[in-house]
């Protein structure tokens, strides 16, 4: 059984723009799958359809054999609890502490009123501190999040997903706004938790060299369709040119070695 299955998935926006066209994909547990393609190719739409931040128009998406497309109420909340999300612009409460932001990953496990009052049990705080230690910012736990650098804020996002105890992490252009050194640190963190914890990573990346260096699998999208799906080791520059529909520009390669 695949951990994520896209079955005949299509997405048409109200303005009639076609975001996804009949997508059929299976993502296995423990994969580090990278989605690549030009801006507007459907990368974010595909990624965000997994946890239903974007609802699809037709088809069905399954998480560990259960349809998230048809899930509602508590069943949907329980499925989403298993899927962490990392955004390009961090999506943190900037005036809150690092620890409080990481603890927000536990919201799906408790009544809303407890979370509003900040009544997190001791076990949750231990999980949050462990997650911060894993991404090497435990010493920042009591600082305000907006006092940290962009790279450190993205690591808070990763720690939040870990504290959530997600088996799947979706990362939507998580390093697009970071410098090369910080990019390497964040990507190394994602690879480490993928390899050590077996967490499945599905990530959108703009840069070709990052996709090849960190991904185990490349999924190429063009105009909402999958035009390449194979091992990262076999994704040549010619294949990337086919995905992009043109020659790859130097500023789209960006390695981190």
Curated annotation (Swiss-Prot):
Keyword Translocase among UniProt keywords: yes
Localization terms from the record: Cell membrane
Identification of the protein by name: Phosphonates import ATP-binding protein PhnC
SMART domains in UniProt: AAA
Family note: Belongs to the ABC transporter superfamily. Phosphonates importer (TC 3.A.1.9.1) family.
Protein origin, superkingdom: Bacteria
Entries under Pfam families matching the protein: ABC_tran
Predominant localisation class: membrane
